[in-house]
Swiss-Prot record:
Residues the record lists as binding Mg(2+): D243, E286, D313
Similarity field: Belongs to the enolase family.
Gene: eno
InterPro entries the record matches: Enolase (IPR000941), Enolase-like_C_sf (IPR036849), Enolase-like_N (IPR029017), Enolase_C (IPR020810), Enolase_CS (IPR020809), Enolase_N (IPR020811)
Name assigned to this protein: Enolase
EC number: 4.2.1.11
One GO CC term, this protein: cell surface
Organism: Dehalococcoides mccartyi (strain ATCC BAA-2100 / JCM 16839 / KCTC 5957 / BAV1)
Length: 428
């Protein structure tokens, strides 16, 4: 007999930025236990599901989550009591119905996601399986190529570049463990290079360095130097990935690059990226344009979509309606997957499957406000996503995910494949 939900208890905990977030514990009728904690973003897409905050300025500057916690402990708890834990789709559909809004504004995506994931963890425990195997009981699994965010700017760091994230991807590694080693060595090499330039080596929200560099190009140049100093070849062993978070640069129909004193039109921004791709070993650009600049996205995809992964984050917000339009209009070739943008596990998996069915890649991602929860590591492996974005190899809320992937790779042995360049399905 399948185990059913016996109890659920949510609480307010802290994320890595010291802001409150929701954690939920689920106990099943057979005694199995599952726990999940929800992350939170700094630069958020306007189309994301609603993260319910209290707005009470006397607590945590209005960022408390007592309302979301209460929604789990009352409305959700009574609705899912006795519910078959292994029926994830039905459970998530029930949560969506209970909420009844298009953007999860009533219960809160944070309340719903904590519930959805905690039940999945409990159901996996009930079957004595790790979460990745419970979600996809397969003979072989693909471990993800990591995107290490080693240099931060934009909203993730003050006094730095216009663009939010400069990342390295160890595409030439033979295993996840080797990829982690390569990325970490480049990270430490970058620290030495920055110190040699008398630059600040304090770290941003995601563990990357946040130096004061005169231009955006300097960020790429300094990373290339760090790759070489670590003994690796840029464009062969290690590639560069970018997340400029361009929606943060967009105002009144133009893109403002403050460090370069430039204001660019959509077409000029596309040409800007084309120029960078010609010059540097860039394999992936996320949110290269504003989240509603559909014409710009289509132009960028036409120009460089056959040689660079173009990832929609704020553009798609893990939402299958927006993704479906993107696929039909050829507006990119990849989607960033963030569980809390949509608010349930089933909807997240549906977005990954939709992308893969279109021949697109799906990059499983953390948020800048994280916890020690490692669900995304299991999700990336379960869905054979091939890529994961979870910060620098620094700060334990980031390394928790990398360490989980090391353990999964070890557990799987010969059944684990590290895809390298094959993770980029759509590049010529």
């Amino acid at each position: 007999m399948s185990a059913v939900v016996k109890s659920i208890k949510a609480r307010e905990i802290l994320d890595s930025r010291g802001n409150p977030t929701v954690e939920a514990d689920v106990v099943l009728s057979d005694g199995s236990f599952g726990r999940a904690a929800v992350p939170s973003g700094a630069s958020t897409g306007s189309h994301e599901a609603v993260e319910l905050r209290d707005g009470d300025k006397s607590r945590y500057n209005g960022l408390g989550v007592h309302k979301a916690v209460a929604n789990v402990n009352t409305t959700i708890a009574s609705a899912i009591s006795g519910f078959k834990a292994s029926d994830q789709q039905r459970l998530d559909n029930l949560l969506i119905e209970l909420d009844g809004t298009p953007n999860k504004a009533k219960l809160g995506a944070n309340a719903m996601l904590a519930t959805s994931l905690a039940v999945a963890h409990a159901a996996a425990a009930s079957r004595h399986m790790p979460l990745y195997r419970y979600l996809n009981n397969s003979e072989e699994y693909i471990l993800p190529v990591p995107m290490f965010n080693i240099l931060n700017g934009g909203k993730h760091a003050s006094n730095s570049t216009d663009f939010q994230e400069f990342m390295v991807m160890p595409v030439g590694a033979k295993s996840f463990a080797q990829a982690l080693q390569m990325g970490t060595e480049v990270y430490h090499s970058l620290k030495k290079v920055l110190k040699g330039m008398n630059q600040n080596t304090t770290v941003g929200d995601e563990g990357g360095f946040a130096p004061s560099l005169p231009t955006n190009k300097d960020a790429v140049e300094v990373i290339l130097k760090a790759i070489e100093k670590a003994g690796y070849r840029p464009g062969e062993d290690i590639f560069i990935a970018l997340d400029p978070a361009s929606s943060e640069l967009y105002q009144d129909g133009k893109y403002t690059l403050a460090t370069e004193n430039k204001t660019l039109s959509s077409a000029e921004m596309v040409d800007y990226w084309c120029g960078w791709v010609e010059k540097y070993p860039i394999i992936s650009i996320e949110d290269g344009l504003f989240e509603d600049d559909w014409d710009g996205w289509k132009l960028l995809t036409r120009k460089i979509g056959n040689k660079v992964q173009l990832v929609g984050d704020d553009f798609y917000v893990t939402n299958i309606k927006r993704l479906d339009r993107g696929i039909k209009e050829k507006a990119s070739n990849s989607i960033l997957i963030k569980l809390n943008q949509i608010g349930t596990l089933s909807e997240t998996i549906a977005a990954i499957k939709m992308a893969n069915n279109a021949g697109w890649t799906a990059v499983v991602s953390h948020r800048s406000g994280e916890t020690e929860d490692t669900t995304i590591a299991d999700l990336a492996v379960a869905m054979n996503a091939g890529q994961i974005k979870t910060g620098a190899p620094c700060r334990s809320e980031r390394t928790a995910k990398y360490n989980r992937l090391l353990r999964i790779e070890e557990e799987l042995g010969g059944k684990a494949k590290y895809p390298g360049k094959d993770a980029f399905l759509n590049l010529k």
